[in-house]
């Protein structure tokens, strides 16, 4: 029996389609993005990237670049303060400062093609580019690792020599596997032995880039008073603040991040690449503001994509079409440093199904590719690809309807997720019923042209909403309009979706709201726009602020 729930429909603001508050500035070109930032005395930065996939840095000669007219400063990793193993928030995950420092600028080794090895600040872009090309680097080429099989081989070259891997709680050195974890409950082997059909398959996937339109950029000023001001295209200004401060070894209170519009992120703009480099070059250049804009080829070559890898999936069912057991190995590429989305993949992979016995083993594996990053429900698409492929094969083998099979095995309230968490209410059954009853599923496919294939598919997938902290301030003006300050980067019109929730409480049109996103000194901490959290979490902050405003107006 599928539970039904009543949903309130008599909203005056929520559920409508107003004109976005940021729409006019964006369609007329007046909106300010990171690449548009202009401040007095601005100079330009550029970086030298490694042409090699895996190599040891034997020496760097920057003298020719430093001697050029128009060059203010040259930077290598030795200019960074020593970073510890501490971690700071980077939106949908955390950043290890020691690893992140050598990711944004290599120290003793390069771990992927495009890895930054040096940077310059110069009077203009052309001079900066010319200076970068004068820097000489001596490399010792090393054998590259391009996939998880090579990385896990006994004789594999080691990418990160000081890595201490966590393999099911055991500390392991001389390894490319940063972490192995396992979630298991029920008697998995016994359940497979009692199954009427067992199918085991392995799927592989490549790293995929988010493909946002606007490239990474940052402008930074390290002023004489020790304070740093940053402008950066980011999904979270406070993440830029914490990472920049941590990498430079200064208090977060010394870093102010100004909000600029963001031209797409999809999870790929939660990490910093340029802000700390720009700040250090600014200090070495006498406090001049330094600006970086990444070129398109470097965006694809050296910024964080979604992880590729390999997933082994084994599923058992009985003759009635009920899943009896599942066992999966998730082997995802973290890139040149630890931290793939394998943890999230382990949560998502079996979450859509009510399975009495399961085993999930995850592997976070280093390869000579750019450090991976989030991309639209990080880890879930890879996991869904693996399990849904096998589910479809099971249905084909048993001659079962693919929606009905998913309904018969759907996770519901009380189902235990693969990592042990027990679900509260979830709407998967309602979604599947709606799909089964829709014209999209039941309409005829029509004639198939010669040489073509025409079909219709169904798949289930899972993602969890992020939580975290958000801040929203509301100020009622004398004319009845409302000034709204909130800390979430606007992706997809979140200014408006947040304002709509407050407007619903206040009983006024959302057009009477004037939303803005202040700098990090002028609004309370707010987490990243990512992890499916913003409309809910920042919206809840706006809702609570509106409730308090109503109470004050009544007094």
Which functions belong to the PLM regions below?
Residues 1-29, 417, 432-449, 473-477, ...:
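Intrinsic disorder at enzyme termini
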Residues 1-172, 198-201:
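Flexible, low-hydrophobicity surface segments
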Residues 16, 21-28, 92-100, 170-218, ...:
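Glycine-rich loop/linker segments at domain edges
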Residues 47-81, 118-139, 217-285, 342-347, ...:
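Alpha-helical support elements that line or immediately flank enzyme active sites
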Residues 116, 123-124, 285-336, 540-555:
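Phosphate/diphosphate-binding loops
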Residues 158-248, 410-481, 500:
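Helix-loop-helix junctions that connect adjacent transmembrane helices in secondary transporters/permeases
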